[in-house]
Amino acid sequence: MKTRLLSFLLLFLLVCSAQSQTYQPTEENLKSRQEFRDNRFGIFLHWGIYSMLATGEWTMTNKNLNYKEYAKLAGGFYPAKFDAARWVSAIKASGAKYICFTSRHHDGFSMFHTRFSDYNIVDATPFKRDILKELADECHKQGIRLHLYYSHIDWYREDAPWGRTGRGTGRPNPKGDWNSYYKFMNNQLTELLTNYGKIGAIWFDGWWDQDQNPDFDWQLPGQYAMIHRLQPACLVGNNHHQAPFAGEDIQIFERDLPGENRAGLSGQDISALPLETCETMNGMWGYKITDQDYKSTKTLIHYLVKAAGKDANLLMNIGPQPDGELPAVALERLAEVGEWMKVYGETIYGTRGGCIAPHPWGVTTQSCLLYTSPSPRDCS
């Protein structure tokens, strides 16, 4: 009886110990968080074979395109004008300190060379070049940090469980094979964190696809732990529209500044983690030929300033063209924002949100600066 009681107590203590364990970021990770906050400005790049259709990155599900037919787009994807050096140079000139690139979006096409699926930029297209490798090499060369977007959704793979999107793409098994799919994702993440040098962050998206299935378990703790094991300094963020989960290093807000919820996607509480808001330069994330509603340079600068005033980074999105070039208007905006940043960038970089709440006339930061329209002035 005593032996059984002792065994029970030991088991109870082990369970309690396991439950009490929480994510403890390493010193390298904490340093990366501060550097992330100091950088304040990044550029998001949504690019994939969906750019060929020129109707945005969600066309596959919005138009219920059959997954096998959609995959044929890869056979014609040849972005002959892609030049990683030109991309990175233009982005660096804007004052942005990092790039977040869509390594794999919801359509399941990998924009890097992976051993775990033939459905990728090298094996499935006539282009035959690892775009991510070229971009990563150029980022490291020019001193721009590289973050990688990675979708938890896949409208192409048959082992990916169905969520509330991608239900009309013709995949045969709604339940999929979670163990197979989870292993596939972790294998790809291992490649991304092994073959492309230092990665500043993994930017997840798609958790919300299972929000109508509360019992679904994405098994995020194991995935996050793997990332931190492979690159301890790599930050983990998840665009799940919730308060941060254990193991995450940054908090993401989509199309809204922290504390605002005008788009209906960012009503979550604000945490003590570094903050980032992502917004489009025009209307769409991926390239859409009819979307010429680009925000003015003044509007983009004001958004950057407001984000800094709310202690958040701005991740501003561009959808590259199918030929591999950045749209001309986007290049103009980058150059114009860059001119402003040359003069006032020191009032953005390294700042923290001010003690006075943002107002229509401007915002404050802990660098003791008052930002007013159209330019900041010293308030010391």
List PLM regions with ranges.
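Mature catalytic domains of secreted/periplasmic carbohydrate-active enzymes
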Residues: Q21-L370
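Bacterial N-terminal signal peptides that target proteins for export
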Residues: M1-L6
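Ordered hydrophobic segments in well-structured contexts
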Residues: L13, L370-Y371
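Single conserved hydrophobic/aromatic residue that forms the stacking wall/gate
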Residues: Y371-S380
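Bacterial N-terminal signal peptides
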Residues: S7-V15
